[in-house]
Amino acid sequence: MVKFLKQNKAVILLQGRYAGKKAVIIKSFDDGTSDRRYGHCLVAGLKKYPSKVIRKDSAKKTAKKSRVKCFIKLVNYQHLMPTRYTLDVDLKEVATLDALKSKDKKVTALKEAKAKLEERFKTGKNRWFFTKLRF
């Protein structure tokens, strides 16, 4: 079978707390691991999307509207819907399986992921990824 859930592929989560949110695959485990015996992947996604910025907004308000909130999570392949989009953000060193094990490592990983995704948003690339799904 062809492996199409590769690194940097944009996906939409279908189940759980972040259902309907967009995420990007960081690392995939096609054959599973010893503790999770099914195909799954590590994803980083947007918990809260940036708001629409208008011209008359002040610089302070524009900065506030450009903020994003992130999540890092292990997700079963069954709970993902792949898209045709890819996101060229290097989150491999930021979010690791080790970062999910302890609270303080996860907090630092979330801050770094947030910074990288906000920087990507401000450059204006991957506009589709930073827009909320309408459904």
UniProtKB/Swiss-Prot annotation:
InterPro entries: Ribosomal_eL27 (IPR001141), Ribosomal_eL27_CS (IPR018262), Ribosomal_eL27_KOW (IPR041991), Ribosomal_eL27_sf (IPR038655), Translation_prot_SH3-like_sf (IPR008991). GO terms for biological process: translation. Pfam families: Ribosomal_L27e. The keyword Aminoacyl-tRNA synthetase does not apply. It comes from the Eukaryota. GO terms for molecular function: mRNA binding; structural constituent of ribosome. Coiled coil: none annotated. One of its GO terms (cellular component) is cytosolic large ribosomal subunit. Keywords: Ribonucleoprotein, Ribosomal protein. Belongs to the eukaryotic ribosomal protein eL27 family. This is Large ribosomal subunit protein eL27y.
